[in-house]
Amino acid sequence: MGKLTKNQKLAAGKIEAGKAYSLKEAASLVKEITFTKFDASLDIDVRLGVDPRKANQMVRGVVSLPHGTGKQVRVLVLCTPDAEAAAKEAGADYVGLDEYIEKIKGGWTDIDVIITMPSIMGKIGALGRVLGPRGLMPNPKSGTVTMDVAKAVREVKQGKIDFKVDKSGIVHTSIGKVSFTAEQIRDNAKEFISTLNKLKPTAAKGTYIKSIYLSSTMSAGIKIDPKSVEEI
């Protein structure tokens, strides 16, 4: 391992080994230990007491973060011509149908979210090999297959994100930027964890939220005491 930089040493000195911080403390601390020249993303990792291999213990959902994600989300709407104007007005970056389907078949995926209509899904099914591995396939459960594409665009632009537990039982997502205030970070984290609690599978036994870590793009993870989330 290479030598630590001056900033890395400063950051390491601020985190007490083995300590579980309150969410309030962690939201302030993550700003103190991030020294990037760019506006780093803030990530949260929550380990759940579930077995994702079992269908009745899969955790997947959507959450609208109170303060958004701070990211510019590029949205493609695949829709019928009568819905195009509303989608554009709502803020979609790309709107169309056949021309974008052909672009995607050719490997174009320079987007973050695809929103479409139920009547269009038949055409999109063939794109699964391109979109699936990148997590871009529209899904009714995440609200990206809908008759009201304009509403879906507004929600995504305002900070609605979808998430699911991975094979090792961890849910990972971004909840903002390091430029956010500590209060905004706390609000977003609390809303996300509250949503996870509501999605607890009835088949899950024992401790549900096993651990929570908050970090920025270039920082170490800060361990959070799950009990502290409800204290704010």
Swiss-Prot record:
PROSITE patterns given in the database record: RIBOSOMAL_L1
Supply the Gene3D superfamilies for this chain: 3.30.190.20, 3.40.50.790
**CDD domains found in the cross-reference section:** Ribosomal_L1
Q: Does the keyword rRNA-binding apply?
A: yes
State the family named in the UniProt similarity comment for this chain: Belongs to the universal ribosomal protein uL1 family.
Recorded GO MF terms: rRNA binding; structural constituent of ribosome; tRNA binding
Reply yes or no: does the keyword Ribosomal protein apply.
Answer: yes
Q: PANTHER family under this entry?
A: 54S RIBOSOMAL PROTEIN L1, MITOCHONDRIAL, LARGE RIBOSOMAL SUBUNIT PROTEIN UL1M
> Cellular component per GO?
large ribosomal subunit
Native organism:
Bacteroides fragilis (strain ATCC 25285 / DSM 2151 / CCUG 4856 / JCM 11019 / LMG 10263 / NCTC 9343 / Onslow / VPI 2553 / EN-2)
Q: What protein is this chain from? A: Large ribosomal subunit protein uL1
- Which keywords does UniProt give here? Repressor, Ribonucleoprotein, Ribosomal protein, RNA-binding, rRNA-binding, Translation regulation, tRNA-binding
Q: Which domain of life is it from?
A: Bacteria
Quaternary structure and interacting proteins, as annotated? Part of the 50S ribosomal subunit.
Concerning Pfam families, the annotation shows: Ribosomal_L1
**Lineage, highest ranks first:** Bacteria, Pseudomonadati, Bacteroidota, Bacteroidia, Bacteroidales
